[in-house]
């Protein structure tokens, strides 16, 4: 199925501070198409456009703004996610996806004081402002990268209370119907032992335990959550 996507419209709109208002309805349409046909890459052109605009410096970003991290609390919860994409997700792509899916809708809310303003996250990685919601990205080969400082609230769980007191681990793969590699689980366990020894095992949960989603996969609760907890004890 060919997805109708107006590349010129997106290119022009992404040059404005309120791009998320100008493109909000269009992206909602793409999301609706994606729900009707999950296998189609209906949202990919939008992600590509945002990624390119960020890379080229076309998309205006705020240089100051709301302190979204003032609600940060002591970490007592680990939330596990998957990218639901094929392995090898570039950080630039993840950044574009979360800017469009998370920050765009928030800034588009008319009740917000920052409505219509350039998007500002206040989150920085390697001296660049970033918008991804995960603190850790874990590859299937066991490489684990701490991509969001723990002092930042990651926008990942779909529940602000959980966000304020959690860190998010995301496995770089589509785990809807399969388990992550042993190397990936071992990397997560090692990172938890080293950085978050205070988190109780019952508070190591999946995204599916917070909101109605399959993430991080159908086998998380019946199978590989237990394997992760066993590795924590090893």
Predicted regions: what they are:
Residues 66-151:
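Secreted/periplasmic proteins that engage bacterial cell-wall peptidoglycan
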